[in-house]
Amino acid sequence: MSQGSATRYPLVLVPGMLGFIRLVLYPYWYGIVSALRQGGATVFAVQVSPLNSSEVRGEQLLARIEEILRETGAEKVNLFGHSQGSLTARYAAAKRPDLVASVTSVAGPNHGSELADYLHKHYPHDSAKGRLMSFLLRIIAALMSLLETSYRGPKLPVDIPASHHSLTTEGVRLFNQ
């Protein structure tokens, strides 16, 4: 077996908004986990709240990191965040740098999301359109939770306004301070 993907510390893959580990038969990290493992890496795809603030998701990630460290005996992990998972990973690394060797951000809204800004402007949470969008997102999150076939932990909280604000330019500006 090739050791081309082996790392000193386990890789922890952190999904973005509405992320999952496996939705029925479709893995979020399609092909990536198996390819990295074939290359010799120790890999964990984790689940955090699909719709919540980067800070809440980050605290959930920290709890999972501590479990992974106990399970593997490793001193640290390498975090690999996709989309909002990048902010989640950055939060965990900032709060507990002693547990995190590196953070890789893939398509992370590290300066905010134009889409989140657009939705904030045109679909305010207290408007009829905003309430409808929140309702639809809650339904989507609930359906995804029912169809998730790999996560076996406690039900994760959903906070759509916090999730949305975390991705706006203003929300990320505050996060980056």
Give the role of each language-model region.
Residues 1-2, 101:
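Generic signature of intrinsically disordered, low-complexity, basic-rich segments
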Residues 2-41:
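Short, surface-exposed "cap/lid" segments of acyl-processing enzymes
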Residues 15, 43, 59-176:
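Serine-dependent carboxylesterase/thioesterase catalytic core
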Residues 19-20, 51, 111:
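Active-site loop signature of alpha/beta-hydrolase-fold enzymes
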Residues 31-52, 104:
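Conserved alpha/beta-hydrolase
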